[in-house]
Amino acid sequence: MKIATIKTGLASLAMLPGLVMAAPAVADKADNAFMMICTALVLFMTIPGIALFYGGLIRGKNVLSMLTQVTVTFALVCILWVVYGYSLAFGEGNNFFGNINWLMLKNIELTAVMGSIYQYIHVAFQGSFACITVGLIVGALAERIRFSAVLIFVVVWLTLSYIPIAHMVWGGGLLASHGALDFAGGTVVHINAAIAGLVGAYLIGKRVGFGKEAFKPHNLPMVFTGTAILYIGWFGFNAGSAGTANEIAALAFVNTVVATAAAILGWIFGEWALRGKPSLLGACSGAIAGLVGVTPACGYIGVGGALIIGVVAGLAGLWGVTMLKRLLRVDDPCDVFGVHGVCGIVGCIMTGIFAASSLGGVGFAEGVTMGHQLLVQLESIAITIVWSGVVAFIGYKLADLTVGLRVPEEQEREGLDVNSHGENAYNA
């Protein structure tokens, strides 16, 4: 799809969904309803979407620990977001942080609007993104991290990594000023979370028996259910990042459908060739790979670009969870880096290509060439990787020094459900 009327679009769209529009401050009821629905969909991605997806991927003796970690970190992020997160991410400030004018949402009038939606809805929508990002990380730490360590890490990482990167990309900070394109969270959400997960997986070490015992998903129907919820919720994630129910939201919606379908096929046929059989897990993983890959691009590219990004993301994700994972020698139980990191990087780079009007996209900002845009995209990826990696290292080390990162070996063997939470998912 080609939208020829948006020549100035990318200069401003690069700051979506954190953009404060310059249009008259008039709330539109339809846009507000649309954004509230999108916010609810993104919240639904975390609870229960990502919890069920990850819960099914791990062993049955640890499934409740995963559901608990996702649920409690979700609650923690919600509180931190309204206390200071939103203000530091989207308040006016410097290249890295906003200000403190909106602490506890102070100074935000009930009737304050951003573009055509009430600012309170913007607070909730952006908070839902912070929640899902933190939820993604815990999959890399599954089956051996101490519950209290997760909470300490989340406070540090949300404050010093998620918030500044969100400000840099969507809040008018450094990367926004450079013209980085990230429509719905390729850098802010997926690469950011994947790097934090990878660092954590290295620091916490491999699970007891890793490489010697067969660690298989204990409940594939649960994985499928989680995938379906994530898929539906992702339409709120991507289309909602337009900030209004307009033609860009429609474009993002269609591109999400196309890229997901293409990635499922890409992953499945790749797996079929590699292993001799297509699997349900492969189809679910392919869907997530396509959704991740199209996230930074969905509002900038045409349908042809979405198709290509989907296929490439599907194959790249398959490579990420097989060959790259073996190369890295890391125990990432839910393949957070292999899917979200690899496909997030692929999507961000390809956004700089397929946003070109000659390739069906909405076109670059005036005077910007594809080569320049690709350099900016690479810059945004590099900054996100380094920033998130350093902050994650600090966060994990702080948690380790205070409460210890990992549960004792005997507790790990017995399972975190019983030892950390005093419950069993499957009682005889």
UniProtKB/Swiss-Prot annotation:
Changing residue 241 to A: 4-fold increase in transport activity with methylammonium as substrate. Shows 80% inhibition by thallium. Changing residue 406 to A: Almost loss of activity. It holds the Pfam family Ammonium_transp. GO terms for cellular component: plasma membrane. Disulfide bonds: none annotated. The record marks 190, 340 as: Twin-His motif. Important for optimum substrate conductance. SUPFAM superfamilies: Ammonium transporter. In the presence of high extracellular ammonium concentrations, transport activity is inhibited by interaction with the regulatory protein GlnK. Ammonium transport through AmtB is required for GlnK sequestration. Formation of the GlnK-AmtB complex is influenced by intracellular pools of the effector molecules ATP, ADP, Mg(2+) and 2-oxoglutarate. The rapid drop in the 2-oxoglutarate pool upon ammonium influx and a simultaneous, but transient, change in the ATP/ADP ratio promotes AmtB-GlnK complex formation. Residues 23-32, 91-119, 172-185, 242-248, 301-302, 356-370 are periplasmic. NH4(+) binds at residue 241. The record marks 182 as: Important for the deprotonation of the ammonium cation. InterPro entries: Ammonium/urea_transptr, Ammonium_transpt, Ammonium_transpt_CS, NH4_transpt_AmtB-like_dom. PROSITE patterns: AMMONIUM_TRANSP. Keywords: Ammonia transport, Cell inner membrane, Cell membrane, Membrane, Signal, Transmembrane, Transmembrane helix, Transport. Changing residue 190 to K: Loss of transport activity with methylammonium as substrate. Involved in the uptake of ammonium/ammonia (NH(4)(+)/NH(3)). Transport is electrogenic. Following sequestration of NH(4)(+) at the periplasmic face, NH(4)(+) is deprotonated and neutral NH(3) is transported into the cytoplasm. Neutral NH(3) and charged H(+) are carried separately across the membrane on a unique two-lane pathway, before recombining to NH(4)(+) inside the cell. In vitro can also transport the larger analogs methylamine and methylammonium. Also acts as a sensor of the extracellular ammonium concentration. Belongs to the ammonia transporter channel (TC 1.A.11.2) family. This is Ammonium transporter AmtB. The gene is amtB.
